[in-house]
């Protein structure tokens, strides 16, 4: 795992090094640059050494032909298989790194090589002869990649703070993104909090050549249903999980696992224990409040698998200086209650392991959240009540303003819009009153741009309501909240976190599963729980009520914390500059609207 950055256009060595050094935490083991001012190209790299710790793995790295140069963040787990295929075709390798395999694969097969990669990655390759920059992000968005189109070219980096070191990248705020954040607690889609900084979306690649930019999608998750026995599905899923975990245990440094005691982390740890010849190191965060604490279940799983276990219990006392530093590390506003616990479990792990396996992605893949059942019940109720489509309401709808008319039509006809409303109150919430006189702001909630993360037409054929909900989360919540949080909080600790359940073959298998094998009569993640039964876990452990890793915002609102938070908000710079309305915020505080208060703080 590493930090990458670069530019095409105006720039120099000092700018490139400043960008690179903003990501020292992502790669404290080594650093390098490639700079050709004649062609106006600079690539930077900060290295966290995981595979082949020698200098032969130093980046940026040139291909054997000298035509391509790569700076790369991530891991391609099947690199040895690809390497053997390339060697049969006469390619000679100078190192044992997956970086060189990625570089030579793209040199040999072109962009189609991406389809061979199993893993997580953010890749930048400069082609010297074509004078073309290629940026690639992995299928699920596990690794971040940001870019900005500038006056003279393009700038990119693993983190926004590095991007902003380039003098041609403006720091203007994106008020559209701010409005989205206040509704969903994170910033969805390709936007960021900075108007001229964009995310390269998951499963996309970008080419930049002499001012022309093209962005293409190289992978889609298609939901198709197959009729097979539960045993047949479980056999295939078990094989894929064991294979994915085994591939992610390859490293030249110590490895371990996060263990919450939930279904997903239990699946991952049990698979690791079956594969490993040594006791697996596990790391667990607990809470003093039993409402959120699952450490007793983590201890049960750890003892059952004979692990070497480490525990940390969190008090509901906020280290405000630390939390402000974490928001800086996150690059953008993020009102996720598990931000600090994620940082703390990463910090507790880094002295004992350099690579960690995590169960992230299980809830989105196998319908683990309660919101999926709520949405299913809502959609079933609509059918029972025979709520008509937009055609029946057209005479009323056509009298609405154009922007509201468009949203109402989509709401009636598009289940992704209904899911966004049921989950976030996206269309009924209005934060117009929160903004102060110092901000010339118009709300963008009706703007087409602010809803691009809900456009799912390409996935609709044959999809169920639950599939639609999953796709919304795959396009937004998973990459823009969960995976962004894990990446930033792990990398600030110079720790690589791998997510076996987000192996794309597991995703494609899960997309073929009947909904009833994910959510069955109120039982979420049904097939994963059946797999744990196969692995001899007791039913009272498997079917207990889910608590989740993130405490609610109320957990942090102790009397002492609340006083500091309220003082920060009402006397903070944003209120003084009249960006936010003090009157509105005071009203929300008096109503104990902790969610809004937390978002704003």
Residue ranges and their predicted role:
Residues 1-4, 18, 165, 197-202, ...:
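Adenosyl-5′-phosphate
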Residues 85, 166, 365-368, 509:
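Residues that scaffold the ATP/ADP-binding catalytic core of kinase and kinase-like folds
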Residues 139, 343-404, 477, 482, ...:
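Active-site adenylate/phosphate-handling loop in enzymes that bind or generate adenylated species
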Residues 183, 249, 303, 328-331, ...:
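Hydrophobic alpha-helix feature that most strongly marks membrane-spanning transmembrane helices
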Residues 324-328, 350, 372-374, 556-557:
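Short low-complexity, flexible loop/linker segments enriched in glycine and/or proline
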Residues 334-336:
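Acceptor-substrate binding/catalytic loop of class I
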């Amino acid at each position: 795992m590493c930090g990458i950055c670069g530019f095409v256009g105006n720039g120099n060595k000092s700018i490139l090094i400043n960008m690179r050094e903003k990501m020292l935490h992502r790669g404290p083991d080594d650093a390098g640059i490639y700079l050709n001012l004649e062609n106006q190209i600079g690539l930077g790299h900060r290295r966290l050494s995981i595979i082949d710790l020698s200098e032969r793995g130093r980046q940026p790295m040139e291909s054997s032909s000298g035509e391509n140069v790569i700076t790369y963040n991530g891991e391609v787990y099947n690199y040895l298989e690809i390497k053997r295929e390339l060697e049969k075709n006469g390619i000679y390798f100078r190192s044992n790194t997956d970086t060189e395999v990625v570089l030579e694969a793209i040199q040999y097969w072109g962009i189609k090589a991406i389809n061979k990669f199993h893993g997580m990655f953010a890749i930048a390759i400069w082609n010297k002869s074509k004078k073309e920059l290629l940026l690639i992000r992995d299928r699920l968005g596990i690794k971040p990649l940001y870019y900005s189109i500038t006056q003279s070219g393009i700038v990119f980096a693993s983190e926004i703070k590095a991007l902003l070191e380039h003098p041609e990248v403006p720091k203007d705020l994106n008020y559209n993104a701010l409005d989205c954040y206040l509704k969903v607690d994170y910033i969805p889609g390709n936007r960021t909090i900075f108007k001229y900084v964009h995310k390269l979306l998951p499963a996309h690649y970008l080419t930049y050549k002499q001012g022309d930019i093209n962005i293409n999608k190289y992978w889609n998750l298609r939901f198709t249903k197959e009729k097979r026995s539960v045993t047949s599905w479980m056999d295939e899923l078990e094989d894929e999980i064991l294979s994915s975990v085994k591939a992610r245990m390859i490293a030249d440094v110590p490895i371990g696992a996060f263990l919450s005691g939930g279904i997903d982390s239990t699946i991952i740890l049990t698979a690791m224990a079956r594969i490993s010849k040594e006791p697996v190191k596990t790391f667990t965060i607990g809470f003093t409040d039993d409402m959120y604490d699952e450490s007793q279940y983590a201890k049960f799983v750890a003892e059952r698998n004979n692990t070497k276990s480490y525990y940390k219990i969190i008090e509901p006392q906020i280290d405000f200086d630390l939390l402000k530093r974490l928001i800086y590390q996150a690059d953008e506003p993020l009102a996720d209650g598990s931000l600090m616990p994620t940082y703390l479990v990463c910090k507790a792990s880094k002295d004992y392991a350099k690579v960690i396996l995590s169960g992230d992605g299980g809830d989105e893949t196998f319908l683990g959240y309660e919101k999926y059942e709520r949405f299913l019940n809502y959609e079933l109720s609509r059918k029972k009540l025979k709520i008509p489509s937009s055609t029946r309401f057209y005479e009323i709808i056509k009298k609405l303003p154009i922007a509201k008319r468009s949203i109402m039509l989509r709401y009636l006809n598009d289940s992704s819009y209904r899911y966004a409303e049921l989950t976030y109150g996206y269309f009924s919430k209005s934060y117009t009153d929160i903004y102060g006189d110092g901000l010339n702001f118009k709300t963008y909630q009706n703007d087409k741009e602010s809803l691009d993360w809900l456009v799912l037409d390409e996935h609709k054929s044959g999809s169920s309501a639950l599939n639609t909900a999953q796709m919304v989360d795959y396009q937004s919540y998973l990459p823009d909240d969960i995976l962004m949080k894990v990446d930033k909080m792990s990398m600030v600790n110079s720790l690589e976190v791998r997510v076996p359940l987000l192996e794309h073959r597991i995703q494609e298998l899960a997309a073929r599963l009947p909904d009833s094998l994910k959510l069955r009569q109120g039982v979420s993640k049904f097939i994963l729980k059946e797999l744990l039964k196969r692995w001899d876990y007791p039913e009272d452990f498997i079917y207990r009520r889910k608590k989740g890793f993130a405490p609610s915002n109320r957990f942090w609102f102790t009397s002492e914390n609340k006083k500091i938070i309220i003082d920060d908000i009402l006397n903070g710079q944003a209120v003084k500059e009249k960006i936010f309305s003090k009157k509105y915020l005071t009203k929300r505080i008096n109503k104990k609207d902790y969610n809004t208060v937390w978002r704003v703080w």
